[in-house]
């Protein structure tokens, strides 16, 4: 089922949680709502679910405006960050709960409920835990049970509020892949909230970047990462080096630098340039005409890669990331001088 929201506004006192938000969520897509704390992503999810009501605007499900319809009538499944399982119920009873509390005329038979629960527990690969209690499960297992419970009532839309936020990094990474595979099997329209850029880039079909209650950008993970429309999106979607300077006909000239860097810009004047650490090439001093003179300040070895912190002569602190073989070939150490050459630079007007 597709979802459309139009001109949503929601305030909490003086704080604008949603400021004229309009979005389309096509049927069958897995969409990430991504942004920093307080950007409005959870409020938007709760408004779609019917757990929160917008001050104005429309929420359209299956062609009907449901802005004034309660959560129960919207046929959405909601999974919270902190599981919300019933502690006094077994895994089986938790998953069966939504089916057993349906009105009598809609409630399946007990045999149908048992079959459905076992089907869902098999789907989340936890059928062997049916008679356990939540306190006997790991965090990752609890979250999968919470997802099975949400799916039991066959929702038209699945809404996930930072579903892996309370889990450790290793379990989060495993569950991200599992969620993507599950979605590929079920093709249920899914919207999930996250502040984890890597999670959104890895799992989602599309990403909606929010900031201060407004939509900054919508697009595929690759499009949003490679072609950010604003400095905010560039900085939020991963590690970024920032250089202040000026754009002219010759390119971008960083403050304190002698040489211009070739850039694709449709404006001139004060600017901020951004380059990813993996797009900052390191070379011997004066080896390149287009480059930034810097000194090695710190070296951090991260498994197969090396992160190099640089002190630019212009005063900025930069970060480069390269593989161990490339770093070894440079034969540099802390305190050594070098030239940092940006390979891919994005510039935005300075504000």
UniProtKB/Swiss-Prot annotation:
Instruction: Tell me what this protein is called.
Output: Sulfate/thiosulfate import ATP-binding protein CysA
Which SUPFAM superfamilies does the protein's record reference?
A: MOP-like, P-loop containing nucleoside triphosphate hydrolases
Q: Which PROSITE patterns match?
A: ABC_TRANSPORTER_1, ABC_TRANSPORTER_2, CYSA
EC category name: translocase
Q: Where does ATP bind?
A: 35-42
User: What species was this sequence derived from?
Assistant: Burkholderia pseudomallei (strain K96243)
Major localization class? membrane
ABC transporter domain ranges (all copies): 3-237
Upper taxonomic classification of the species?
Bacteria, Pseudomonadati, Pseudomonadota, Betaproteobacteria, Burkholderiales
Say yes or no: keyword DNA damage present: no
């Amino acid at each position: 089922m597709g979802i459309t929201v139009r001109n949503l506004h929601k305030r909490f006192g003086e704080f604008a949680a949603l400021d004229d938000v309009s979005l389309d969520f096509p049927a069958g897509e897995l969409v990430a709502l991504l942004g920093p704390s307080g950007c409005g992503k959870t409020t938007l999810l709760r408004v779609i679910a019917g757990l929160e009501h917008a001050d104005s605007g429309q929420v359209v499900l299956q062609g009907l405006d449901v802005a004034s319809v309660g959560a129960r009538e919207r046929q959405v499944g909601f999974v919270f960050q902190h599981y919300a399982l019933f502690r006094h119920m077994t895994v089986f009873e938790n998953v069966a709960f939504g089916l057993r509390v349906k009105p009598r005329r809609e409630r399946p038979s007990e045999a149908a409920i048992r079959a459905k629960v076992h089907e869902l527990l098999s789907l989340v690969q936890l059928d062997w835990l049916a008679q356990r209690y939540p306190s006997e499960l790991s965090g990752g297992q609890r979250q999968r049970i919470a997802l099975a419970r949400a799916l039991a009532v066959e929702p038209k839309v699945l809404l996930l509020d930072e579903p892996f936020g309370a889990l450790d990094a290793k379990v989060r990474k495993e569950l991200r892949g599992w969620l993507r595979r599950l979605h590929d099997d079920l093709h249920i329209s899914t919207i999930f909230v996250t502040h984890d850029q890597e999670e959104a880039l890895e799992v989602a079909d599309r990403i909606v970047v929010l900031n201060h209650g407004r939509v900054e950008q919508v697009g595929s993970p690759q499009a949003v990462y490679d072609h950010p429309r604003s400095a905010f999106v560039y900085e939020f979607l991963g590690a970024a080096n920032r250089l202040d300077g000026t754009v002219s006909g010759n390119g971008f000239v960083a403050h304190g630098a002698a040489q211009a860097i070739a850039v694709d810009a449709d404006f001139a004047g004060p600017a901020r340039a951004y380059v990813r650490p993996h797009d900052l090439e390191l070379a011997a001093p004066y080896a390149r005409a287009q480059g930034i003179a810097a000194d090695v300040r710190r070296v951090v070895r991260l498994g197969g890669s090396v992160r190099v912190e640089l002190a630019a002569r212009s005063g900025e602190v930069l970060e480069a990331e390269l593989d161990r073989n490339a770093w070894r070939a440079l034969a540099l150490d802390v305190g050594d001088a070098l030239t940092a050459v940006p390979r891919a630079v994005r510039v935005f007007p300075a504000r």
